[in-house]
Amino acid sequence: MNKQRGTFSEVSLAQDPKRQQRKPKGNKSSISATEQEIFQVELNLQNASLNHQGIDKIYDCQGLLPPPEKLTAKMLGIICIVLMSAVLKTIVLIPFLEQNNSSPNTRTQKARPCGHCPEEWITYSNSCYYIGKERRTWEESLQACASKNSSSLLSIDNEEEMKFLASILPSSWIGVFCNSSHHPWVTINGLAFKHEIKDSDHAERNCAMLHVCGLISDQCGSSRIIRRGFIMLTRLVLNS
């Protein structure tokens, strides 16, 4: 009986080391599982970090234009600025160029004060004109012109001059007359007057006047009804 107990004890003791050897195996599996879990967590964190960085890069890239598109946008901006500058220059320069390119005849057709003419006179085609708007007879107008040096009552030279002066003073005496209805029309300088004068058949209408309808005749002593002025002329050689 003691032998059996001893054997059993030995067997039991012999079996105990096996059990003791199994326990380390259980510890190793627990450690390895823990390490795997830690590794998996670290891996997940790394992946999450990489994914976050990738998303940030994507958003950053979305806020920027690719180089070709950026270059195109810059070129379009430069073109717009150049075109706007050209339009502004055109708007500013066209009136200036038109004024400078206007012909001398066009410039002289405009009534304007001239430094070479007396004050309150106007210039047209190298001549100075004084527009007298007072109501006077033909004789009074002739005397008013004679009182000014180198001036005379106007005698029309051409159609352009006649239209120009009629636009300024629609009714005015001119330096043209006739002695009777049977005599020719002459200027105050004694030269034959070549332009047609309407209503010249009346015996008492021996003085000519400029009207919007052209040249007409009237009584030399008349200053009635229509406000008749007069035009004095002084011819000068004006510098351009």
From Swiss-Prot:
Instruction: Name its cellular compartments.
Output: Membrane
Q: In which tissues is it expressed?
A: Natural killer cells.
* Keywords assigned by UniProt, alphabetized: Disulfide bond, Glycoprotein, Lectin, Membrane, Receptor, Signal-anchor, Transmembrane, Transmembrane helix
Assembly and interactions?
A: Can form disulfide-bonded heterodimer with CD94.
User: Example GO biological process term?
Assistant: stimulatory C-type lectin receptor signaling pathway
Q: Mind telling me which InterPro entries this protein's record contains?
A: C-type_lectin-like, C-type_lectin-like/link_sf, CTDL_fold, NKG2/CD94_NK_receptors, NKR-like_CTLD
| Record's protein name | NKG2-E type II integral membrane protein
Q: What does this chain do?
A: Plays a role as a receptor for the recognition of MHC class I HLA-E molecules by NK cells and some cytotoxic T-cells.
* Disulfide linkage: 117-128, 207-220
Q: Where is the C-type lectin domain?
A: 116-230
GO CC term, one of those recorded: external side of plasma membrane
Q: Kindly report every residue range on the membrane side named Cytoplasmic.
A: 1-70
Q: Where is the composition biased (Polar residues)?
A: 1-12
Principal subcellular localization: membrane
- Glycan attachment positions: 100, 149, 179
TM ranges are 71-93
Matches recorded under CDD domains:
CLECT_NK_receptors_like (cd03593)
- Give residue ranges on the Extracellular side: 94-240
Q: Where is this region: Disordered?
A: 1-31
What GO molecular function annotations does the UniProt record carry, in alphabetical order? Answer: carbohydrate binding; transmembrane signaling receptor activity
